[in-house]
């Protein structure tokens, strides 16, 4: 079975909901603090490939994102990845890796579809 890598932020209520769901479904996962250890650039690149909108990869509701005044659409993928790696709070969370699939945020139906 593929390994689930789950990047989370302890203060994030959506992350806590996702953890409860994973536990309820008895799924094993590796839990990583997204602030202390952001996802590797290869996973951020996968997220880009799987999401057509650049902004989707960002935690747009967080203070870290709101404090930067950038035209994300004007930045290259490389610049965006550097920015995301510099501050894990900028990354949409939870950030779940399952094989080659990246799931951003928590949607129970999407988790069920890909993980069960």
Regions flagged by a language model, labelled:
Residues 1-25, 29-34:
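Local sequence-structure signature of Cys/Sec-based thiol-disulfide redox active-site neighborhoods
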Residues 36-116:
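Thiol/selenol-based redox catalytic cores and closely related redox-interacting motifs
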